[in-house]
Amino acid sequence: MDVVEKLVINGSGSSKGGTFQSVEINGSGTVAGDVECDTFSFNGNGKADGSVKAKAVTISGSGKIHGDVEAESIRMNGTGFIQGEVSAKQLKIAGSSTFGGTVKADGIDISGKAVMEADCETETFQSEGKCKISGLLNADQVIIKLSAGESYAREIGCRHLQVTCRKGMLTLLRLMPQPVLTAELIEGDVIELTNTKAKTVRGNKVIIGPDCQIETVEYSGDYTCDPSASVETSTKL
């Protein structure tokens, strides 16, 4: 990358896009146009009206990107919104983030809240927060640790899915909603579920754990079901 200069916006100013060494928005500034840089960081209430291509993108304040984002690393520590498609090696979400387009990454780690309005494709998907995926979650390995409230994925397709539950004191005292994963279809090789509601679960090895409500289970290998779980129909393929 040909480095041109650093771009720093401290306040409510605006700048056109371009190629930079780094871009930093510390106020409510706006970058109008596509940006290519090494690092792009939001520390205030900033906005990028174009697409962003960078090695690292960090949102620590409240940042909005209205185009596509291509980066090696994306870290969302604040409130982030990316309207376009996302392509990254690593995506880490510790704040509250919304993605309007398809999300593709080698690894996704969620400890905050993530809303994905389209499909999500990754090798490894880990969530200890809350997630809502309106499309297909396609991954090699999916590990979801539920804590409170509902996480949702319309469809999950993976090699290995493990859903566990960690109930905090507020949940045990019924001051917070019970943790649950809700899905229309779950399909994979090895599926281990806890606190899950699904219409169809299809896999080779299927383990239905406590507090699950499943309409249909289809399995080709092993199948076990916890006594506290509800499964309307189970069929060996």
Swiss-Prot record:
Any matching Pfam family: Bactofilin
InterPro entries, sorted: BacA/B (IPR007607)
Family designation: Belongs to the bactofilin family.
Protein name, per record: Uncharacterized protein YhbE
